[in-house]
């Protein structure tokens, strides 16, 4: 792949045009690696990943035949995504939760940790050992592995390659699209910008996750008519324009540079369009009930009869961290989840809801361990809202992560040691070290003569934005390459045990819900042979591609 786009991006950076949040996810792959690192040509095809997932489902069907016959199918599917929610994050978050309750902490459990089934998913991208949130979103929402930095396309599309992404045979559909095709309703909820990688995986087809508004696309020299930005795709194109609930941040991606939002954040669009108004006009023309929301008070005033369509953009960029947010304007993830379920539950056929605790990831990137753990606890509260609201015998709730981080939970401290404090011993140089530390990130301190500084003497030691001990200095802490947990509750939860590719997750959800083009629990495994089913499945994928982009 050519390096022309690197020159464009470098020039944009010099001019101060690159979005500030790029520091969380710097592009670390060298030019050309987006395609050259592909392990095999087959992995660039959607059929490779679809076949692998469907064959695994067939094996699981045989293993769980009795449970399959007894449970029926899931009418409602809710997927919770803890962005960057690694196993050490879970262990530390549950310990913090217990210590907040006056316990020693280790014995506590998050609500979703009590789900009956636990599995593990492998998170690598086709071209990367350690993934980002866009190739993983394509995996756990579309069932196909992709290149780092791309969304809703196969690995045949290198990052930044606008032209390749316009090929309909290289686009893939998400479980949200499968739900819509089955007559169910769809909602997406996140604490990040709604155009960010994870939520965008439900609807966007882009060669670069950073193309959140039209100016992002233009900066790389591309035609927005050929490669529409993510905000445009959400508001003006299927499937996004059919979503009943859209809750998150990112007003700036929808507003022109000539306009500021309700809290003074200036828009980033250079096409002069106000996509929030366009969304309202579209709903008005359809003669459906709708409402645009920008703060918590408006959300809470909806009451028991919210309108059919809701667009809630609660910040100019990402929502504030829970511990730092303004309660008058900032809704909690639990509140957003509650409203979303109430709206979507009115569809008798059921719904698919995607909920992301997205700022776990951002806190880890900044080495803010306390904030990362609190964001995890906040997502857990949202999960409890969902399981309290839904019937276990007609719903499936899956809680997972897209990737991990490099925070470790270490030392040999006694039971009940403050999880946010120091280990009850010193290092070989008689210096204290933290229970939670990071392999890399911006929290690294300069060592004098090979001796670590005493971090407990920092002026802001223990503050929310105090950076815990870090080894390797980087502007942004990196993701990890280890497996992520998959917790399942409800109808056919047993399908999610074991170790499998992350691409299995949407196929298994669709199987349990009897929707989408793959194998379904509603169809006997003996009725449709795998080879015949795969032919039908691929034909359905192609049909959906064309329907989605007409």
From Swiss-Prot:
Positions where lipid (GPI-anchor amidated serine) attaches: 524
EC annotation from Swiss-Prot or TrEMBL: 3.1.3.1
Catalyzed chemical reaction(s): a phosphate monoester + H2O = an alcohol + phosphate
Residues that bind Zn(2+) 2: 83, 402-403
Location of this chain's protein in the cell: Cell membrane
Cofactor(s) the protein requires to work: Mg(2+); Zn(2+)
Gene Ontology, cellular component aspect: plasma membrane; side of membrane
Maturation propeptide residues: 525-550
Family: Belongs to the alkaline phosphatase family.
Record's protein name: Membrane-bound alkaline phosphatase
Gene source species: Bombyx mori
Gene name of the encoded protein: Alp-m
